[in-house]
Regions:
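Conserved small/polar residues in nucleotide/adenosyl-binding loops
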Residues: 107-113
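Acidic/His- and Gly-rich active-site-bordering loop/insert found
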Residues: 2-104
Length: 117
């Protein structure tokens, strides 16, 4: 089984401007990563009348019990006017030992965090 580099994954996830309902490819990206780690995955698409479809990724590793279920999201709120930012929100950087980028404090980055614990 491959190992996951948590910081690298976090940086890669930040690069996706995944503003709902457009996932900007983040679901497919994460699905490929999880498959390489041995997960069985499935992307489901949900759509209600007069709305754009929204994707969800389900991933499972093994069949043993008890189960651990993680429910999170990979979307972000719109960044607004990029001219108002002091950095590009979708270009991760490290400043003074802190990861800087869009969704750093969101559920968006809990997967790398959970994996590292």
């Amino acid at each position: 089984m491959l190992r996951l580099n948590e910081l690298q994954l976090a940086k890669e996830l930040i690069r996706f401007p995944s503003v709902t309902p457009v996932d900007a490819g983040v679901m497919s990206f994460l699905e490929k990563k999880l498959k390489k780690l041995g997960f069985k995955t499935k992307i489901l698409e949900f759509k209600e009348k007069n709305t754009k479809p929204v994707k969800n990724l389900y991933a499972r590793l093994g069949n043993k019990r008890p189960n651990f279920c993680y429910a999170g999201h990979l979307d972000v709120v719109p960044a607004g006017n990029l001219k108002d930012w002091t950095v590009n929100p979708f270009k991760p950087s490290i400043k003074n030992g802190h990861l800087i980028g869009r969704a750093v404090s969101y559920t968006h980055l809990t997967l790398p965090t959970i994996r590292s614990v």
